[in-house]
From Swiss-Prot:
Pathway: Cofactor biosynthesis; coenzyme A biosynthesis
Binding, GTP: D35, V36, D54, K56, E109, D132
Source species, domain of life: Archaea
Function field: Catalyzes the GTP-dependent phosphorylation of the 3'-hydroxyl group of dephosphocoenzyme A to form coenzyme A (CoA).
Enzyme class, UniProt record, top EC level: transferase
A single GO BP: coenzyme A biosynthetic process
Protein name: GTP-dependent dephospho-CoA kinase
Keywords: Coenzyme A biosynthesis, GTP-binding, Kinase, Nucleotide-binding, Transferase
Alphabetical list of InterPro entries matching this protein: GTP-dep_dephospho-CoA_kin
Length: 158
């Protein structure tokens, strides 16, 4: 389990990619992280390969996503950390060549962008919400994977 600290929290406030109000067209493998982002993609006809959700926004406002995912998995991931269970499930899901999967988080999904970048293949598009700004779209690259490895080393491991 990795625990968030102030130094890493400060780093994570900076988007890993470009912030959009409306996303451009997206091709290839897509992972969405967050309920509002996933709902936006689905309502625009974009079905992510994997959607990571907790059915809340801003920690406690319920979000209704009227979509039936093809495959659903659940894990626990407490606020402010990346649980071993979440890491292992994301690692596993990165090897599946399927679409319309959901990883339902009991807890909080905010930090799970980190293991997604670590384990999903290069050129995967990752979309997550940047509170009060829009959606961040990034393509996984080797350089980004190296940045994530550095962040993980700076987090407290338990």
């Amino acid at each position: 389990m990795y625990l968030l600290n102030d130094k890493v929290a400060h780093e994570l406030k900076k988007p890993f990619g470009k912030v959009y109000k409306e996303l451009p067209s997206i091709e290839g493998k897509v992972v969405s992280i967050g309920d509002v982002t996933t709902k936006h993609l689905l309502s625009n006809g974009i079905i992510p390969d994997l959607s990571i959700l907790d059915f809340k926004t801003k920690r406690n406002i319920p979000v209704d996503i009227p979509h039936k995912f093809k495959t659903i998995f659940e894990v626990e991931n407490p606020q402010g950390c990346i649980s071993d269970e979440a890491i292992e499930r994301i690692k596993y899901l990165s090897t599946i060549h399927d679409r319309d999967m959901a990883l339902i988080i009991k807890g909080e999904e905010d930090l799970l962008t980190i293991p997604v970048i670590k384990y999903f293949p290069e050129d995967t598009s990752v979309i997550y919400g940047q509170p009060d700004e829009g959606m961040v779209l990034l393509k996984i690259t080797d350089e980004l994977k190296q940045k994530i490895e550095k962040l993980l080393k700076e987090m407290e491991e338990r």
